[in-house]
C-alpha cells in the first residue's frame, strides 16, 4: 500500500471523526480523554490573580496529575511561540501586566504593568528576560526574572529605527530586528542587529534584503551562529560576532514556526517534508516526508531524540543526526496532535492547538502511546502552550496558567 493510499484511508477516518479541518492544519475537531476541570471551567476566566483549586500532588511516574495551582492571566494571544517560560523556578507569562509566579506554588512574585509591548515573547538570555520597552521609545530592557527589576537597557539608535523587537538572546548578545524609518516615517526596509549584554553597545547591524519584513521572524542561537526563519520562505544563518551572513536559502514554505538547531544541524518542517541542513554550509543532510495531504508541525529535540507530529495526528520519533525513524505512531486519530513538546521524568508531554478537547498530552517516549490528557474544561479552542521546570509542567491556555506536578 503506497503513501497516498494510506493517506486516503486516514483522511476518511479523520473526516468520519469530524476532523476535516485538521487536514488543513487547523486541528479544530479532534477529541480525546479529558481531565475533569481544575476549577471554574466554561469559557469565562476568573479575575486576574484569582486562584482555582490549588493543591495537586505529584502522581506516580507517568500518572495523571492534579493541578497544584491555577491562576488567570492577561495573555493576549499574540506571542506566537514563546508565550510562557520557566527560568530558575520562576514562571513568566506574556501579558500586561507582566506577572511572575513561583513554579511550585503559583504564588505571585511580582507584577509590572506597561513594561513591554503587546505580544512580547518570553526570551531568556543567561538568566535575563529581554523585552522591547512599552514606551515605543526604541529601548530594549533586561529584567531580573526573580524580582522584575530592570538590570539592563540599550537602544539601536536615536531616531532612525522604528520599534526594535527582541528575537533571541544569549550570554553575550541580544539580537533585535527593527524597521528603518525613511523621510516619510515609513519602514520599507529593516535591520537585524546584535547588542552587547555587558556594555549595551551595538556590536553589529546589518540591513536585510528589500522586501523582507521585521515581523514573523523566529530565531535560535547555537554557539557562534544565529539562525532564523521568516514569512518570505527564508532560512538564514549569521555569525553572532560579526553579523556576516553565512548562508541563506528558500525553504519553499513561509514559516514563522519553531525549528531546532542540534549538533551542527538546522532541522525544520517545510510542509510535507522534515529537513536537516548543515549549520555551517547549508547543505541538506537528510529529509523525509509525512503522508500525502499532511504537513509536519514544529519539531523538538529532547534527550537526543527528535519528536514531531503531523496534521493527520501521527507522532514521530527520529534520530536527529541521521533522520532515521525510531518509531511512527499513526494510531492517534482521535486526539489532536501536539505542536510543542517537553520531557520530564521520562515522560513526553505535548501541547495541542485549536481543539476544545485537546490540552496537555502525556506520551510514552518509547512508542508514542498516549498515557493521559489534561484539559482545563474551559471549552476554548485557543492554542495550548507548555514549559517545564524541575518536576513540573506549566500549561498556558484560555487566559489561565496551570502548574502540573508530574514527577
Mark where each language-model region is.
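A short helix->beta-strand "capping" segment at the edge of beta-propeller domains
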Residues: 54-78
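Beta-strand-rich domains and repeat architectures in extracellular enzymes and scaffolds
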Residues: 71-96, 120
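Short, low-complexity, disordered segments immediately C-terminal to signal peptides
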Residues: 32-59
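Short loop/turn segments that connect beta-strands within beta-propeller blades
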Residues: 103-105, 145-147, 197-199, 239-242, ...
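Blade-level signature of beta-propeller repeat domains, shared across WD40, Kelch, NHL, RCC1
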Residues: 381-407
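Short, solvent-exposed loop/turn segments at conserved positions within beta-propeller repeat blades
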Residues: 93, 134-136, 183-189, 229-231, ...
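Repeated scaffold domains used in trafficking and secretory/extracellular systems
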Residues: 78-85, 116-124, 160-169, 211-220, ...
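N-terminal secretory signal peptides
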Residues: 1-7, 18-26
Amino acid at each position: 500500500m503506497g503513501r497516498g493510499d494510506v493517506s486516503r484511508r486516514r483522511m476518511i477516518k479523520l473526516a468520519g471523526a469530524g476532523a476535516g479541518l485538521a487536514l488543513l492544519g487547523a486541528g479544530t475537531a479532534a477529541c480525546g480523554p479529558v481531565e475533569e476541570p481544575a476549577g471554574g471551567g466554561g469559557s469565562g476566566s476568573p479575575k486576574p490573580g484569582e486562584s482555582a483549586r490549588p493543591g495537586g500532588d505529584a502522581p506516580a511516574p507517568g500518572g495523571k496529575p492534579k493541578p497544584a495551582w491555577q491562576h488567570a492571566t492577561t495573555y493576549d494571544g499574540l506571542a506566537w511561540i514563546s508565550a510562557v517560560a520557566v527560568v530558575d523556578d520562576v514562571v513568566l507569562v506574556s501579558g500586561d501586566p507582566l506577572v511572575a509566579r513561583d513554579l511550585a506554588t503559583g504564588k505571585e512574585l511580582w507584577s509590572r504593568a506597561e513594561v513591554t509591548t503587546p505580544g512580547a515573547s518570553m526570551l531568556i538570555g543567561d538568566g535575563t528576560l529581554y523585552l522591547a520597552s512599552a514606551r515605543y521609545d526604541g529601548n530594549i530592557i533586561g529584567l531580573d526574572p526573580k524580582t522584575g527589576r530592570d538590570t539592563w537597557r540599550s537602544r539601536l539608535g536615536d531616531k532612525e529605527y522604528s520599534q526594535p523587537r527582541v528575537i533571541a538572546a544569549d550570554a553575550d548578545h541580544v539580537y533585535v530586528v527593527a524597521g528603518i524609518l525613511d523621510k516619510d516615517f515609513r519602514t520599507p526596509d529593516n535591520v537585524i542587529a546584535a547588542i552587547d549584554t555587558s556594555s549595551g553597545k551595538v556590536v553589529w547591524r546589518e540591513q536585510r534584503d528589500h522586501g523582507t519584513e521585521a515581523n514573523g521572524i523566529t530565531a535560535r542561537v547555537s554557539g557562534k551562529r544565529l539562525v532564523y526563519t521568516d514569512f518570505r520562505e527564508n532560512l538564514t544563518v549569521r555569525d553572532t560576532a560579526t553579523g556576516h551572513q553565512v548562508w541563506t536559502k528558500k525553504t519553499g514554505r513561509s514559516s514563522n514556526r519553531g525549528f531546532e538547531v542540534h549538533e551542527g544541524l538546522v532541522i525544520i518542517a517545510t510542509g510535507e517534508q522534515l529537513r536537516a541542513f548543515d549549520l555551517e554550509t547549508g547543505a541538506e543532510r537528510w529529509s523525509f516526508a509525512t503522508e500525502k495531504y499532511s504537513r509536519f508541525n514544529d519539531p523538538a529535540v529532547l534527550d537526543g531524540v527528535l519528536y514531531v507530529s503531523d496534521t493527520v495526528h501521527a507522532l514521530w520519533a527520529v534520530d536527529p543526526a541521521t533522520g532515521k525513524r525510531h518509531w511512527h505512531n499513526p494510531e492517534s486519530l482521535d486526539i489532536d496532535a501536539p505542536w510543542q513538546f517537553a520531557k520530564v521524568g521520562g515522560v513526553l508531554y505535548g501541547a495541542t492547538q485549536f481543539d476544545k478537547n485537546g490540552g496537555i498530552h502525556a506520551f510514552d517516549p518509547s512508542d508514542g502511546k498516549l498515557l493521559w490528557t489534561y484539559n482545563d474544561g474551559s471549552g476554548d479552542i485557543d492554542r495550548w502552550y507548555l514549559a517545564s521546570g524541575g518536576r513540573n509542567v506549566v500549561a498556558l491556555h484560555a487566559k489561565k496558567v496551570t502548574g502540573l506536578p508530574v514527577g
